[in-house]
From Swiss-Prot:
Keywords: Glycosyltransferase, Transferase. Gene3D superfamilies: Glycogen Phosphorylase B. This is Glycosyltransferase ugt1. It comes from the Eukaryota. GO terms for molecular function: UDP-glycosyltransferase activity. Glycosyltransferase; part of the gene cluster that mediates the biosynthesis of the glycolipid biosurfactant ustilagic acid (UA). UA is a secreted cellobiose glycolipid that is toxic for many microorganisms and confers biocontrol activity to U.maydis. UA consists of 15,16-dihydroxypalmitic or 2,15,16-trihydroxypalmitic acid, which is O-glycosidically linked to cellobiose at its terminal hydroxyl group. In addition, the cellobiose moiety is acetylated and acylated with a short-chain hydroxy fatty acid. Residues 81-106, 342-375 are annotated as: Disordered. Residues 90-104 have a biased composition (Low complexity). It comes from Mycosarcoma maydis.
Length: 578
């Protein structure tokens, strides 16, 4: 018998929606009497339902206990607008005599995400009274039933993603006793966002937190600058230091490239005031991390927020990731498939079409693209030596600048010329190929480099991979990532070291942090960085993948040791509350 009803309201981006959905699945597994209503954009729900990582949606294992409510426009309509915006952007760049490869304006994905967030905020304010009263929710246009009344009754708790503004006002307008919970990505980002100056993408909250600390500890002298610096860090020209974190000082010049002034001015960008309202109203702060990764940062948060419960979600999440790793290990053992030694790997091209070719099977019939990708990847990895594959994925929203991408591919081609064991698995994140995601003026050069890599026989380009499978395959030695926290956590759980090329916001915080715990190499991304400086940084990082690299060997060793600690923590399989 269902006895409790919880609302989860999420920011409309896969990087935020997926961990909240994983959290929902973990809670549903542990509590048979729980029902969860998950609210996000229609677009993100459609994406989650189509991703292999969301088995709890694909096979509906929780039935009516996991209720999905999408807001905003249908997925196909959003995808069409995305395509139109991409075409317009590329046309503008093509018409320009000097294409702007470092545009200050937001990418189409960011614009559409902000639009979807606006609709979530607006729609939630409209439907919350109905959900709170536990009445049936009907569509305003055709009067169809969108969400039936919950058999467990009205919600007792609402879990809100930290990015969504205006939620406290809506909830408290209709309920004074509904328990509120804030969902955050990781404690390092939480601290940096709340304390860091705006110039590095933070919200400048040092003074407010100091006032709160003094009010909570009357014996403290508000003018004690030494204690203030010790607890909250200090700002000096060019750097920002976070106490309690191994991350040390963030270079302000580098962060400026990612802080994006246009983003800070977008109406839906959460301000410090909005986040602080949510934190103040919340009974608990849930953080998607592991104690083995962020123990110092979590201790610091406990000190800054002594009256809040801090929940660590990592051990209770990523169940699908771990299950796939176990199945992969069993499959390799059962079929007596040993990853081939370096000398026995074939040097012939994989049996996949070059970029842009149609997907057909042996009879000339079209094959499902996702299934075709799965087969290609499995074959490619099976033919690869242990640790020889560098896997590259920048997620669904980000791409390197075209000039940087060209240099990246040239350096990778050079590395392949030095060693026949260097192999590359590159996923486009939904694009048809690399060239199609760049301004037309760069497409010929990028397409030529793609073809050169393909002809080497050591490269596989696909527009989709099962990342859970790939990261845990013994052939994969390195993960070149944009530094999204979900990808970072998956890489840590797989014991795979990272090469991080951050593009935006929290990604650089993550890159700095994982570099500080010595499981990642962070490529430099300073503001107005010259192509020559980027080349130097990328070349230094990619040499870590060489078997003889001492630095690379140490990063790999550290990643494997961290994986063992995470496995021990995961054995608890519970949300830990401080």
């Amino acid at each position: 018998m269902a006895t409790e009803h919880i609302l989860l309201v999420c920011w409309p981006a896969v990087g935020h929606a997926r961990p909240m959905l994983d959290y929902a699945a973990a809670q549903l597994k542990q509590n048979p009497g729980l029902i969860i209503t998950f609210i996000c954009s229609k677009m993100q729900i459609a994406l989650l339902e189509g991703l292999a990582i969301s088995e709890h949606l694909a096979d509906k294992k929780f039935g009516d206990r996991l209720r999905l409510l999408g807001t905003g426009r249908p997925a196909q309509e959003v995808l069409k607008e995305f395509g139109d915006r991409e075409d317009a952007k590329n046309a503008a760049n093509s018409a320009s005599k000097a294409p702007n490869t470092t545009a200050n304006g937001p990418e189409p994905e960011v614009i559409l995400t902000m639009q979807a967030a606006t609709l979530i905020q607006k729609r939630f304010a409209e439907i919350f009274p109905t959900i709170l009263a536990n009445d049936d929710l009907f569509d305003e246009q055709d009067n169809s039933l969108l969400l039936p009344a919950c058999v467990a009754g009205k919600p007792t708790t609402i879990v809100v993603n930290w990015m969504l503004p205006g939620m406290v006002e809506t909830v408290r307008k209709h309920s004074s006793d509904l328990k509120m919970v804030t969902f955050f990505d990781n404690s390092c980002t939480f601290v940096t966002r709340m304390l860091g100056p705006r110039s590095i993408g933070g919200f400048g909250g040092i003074e407010r937190l100091w006032s709160q600390y003094c009010n909570s500890n009357p014996e403290v002298d508000p003018n004690d600058s030494t204690l203030k610096e010790k607890l909250l860090g200090r700002r000096w020209t060019g750097k920002f230091y976070i106490p309690g974190s191994r991350m040390g000082a963030i270079e302000e010049q580098e962060m400026a490239a990612l802080a994006k002034d246009w983003l800070l001015s977008v109406p839906l960008t959460p301000s410090l005031i909005e986040i602080q309202k949510l934190v103040d109203a919340s009974h608990t702060i849930l953080i998607n991390t592991h104690l083995a990764v962020e123990e110092r940062e979590l201790d610091y948060l406990r000190m800054v927020y002594p009256f809040k419960k801090i929940g660590i979600l990592g051990p209770a999440m990523f169940s699908g990731f771990v299950e796939k790793g176990e199945k992969l290990a069993a499959k390799l053992l059962d079929k007596h498939i040993n990853v081939k030694p370096a000398a026995s790997r074939p040097l012939t091209p994989p049996e996949t079409p070059p970029p842009g070719s149609p997907d057909t099977d042996s009879h000339g019939e079209e094959e499902d693209p996702k299934q075709k990708s799965v087969k290609q990847v499995e074959k490619f990895l099976a033919e690869s030596a242990t640790g020889s594959v560098v896997y590259i994925s920048f997620g669904t929203m980000f791409r390197p600048q075209p000039t940087h991408l060209i240099k990246m591919l040239e350096i990778i081609i050079y590395e392949m010329s030095l060693s026949s064991q260097f192999r590359l698995l590159f996923t486009f994140g939904g694009s048809k190929d690399l060239a199609s995601s760049c301004p037309p003026s760069f497409a010929p050069q990028i397409s030529a480099l793609e073809s050169q890599l393909f002809k080497s026989g050591n490269t596989l380009f696909v527009n989709w991979v099962d990342q859970h499978y790939v990261l845990q395959h013994p052939s994969v030695g390195w993960f070149l990532s944009h530094g999204g926290w979900n990808s970072c956590q998956e890489s840590m759980l797989a014991g795979t070291p990272l090469l991080i090329l951050p593009f935006f916001g929290d990604q650089l915080f993550n890159a700095y942090f994982l570099e500080s715990i010595q499981i990642a190499y962070r490529f430099n991304t300073a503001a107005n960085m010259s192509v020559a400086d980027f080349v130097a940084s990328f070349r230094e990082g990619i040499t870590c993948t060489r078997p003889e690299s001492e630095r690379g060997s140490q990063l790999t060793k550290n990643a494997k040791e961290l994986q063992l600690r995470l496995k021990g923590e995961r054995a608890l399989a519970e949300v830990r509350l401080f």
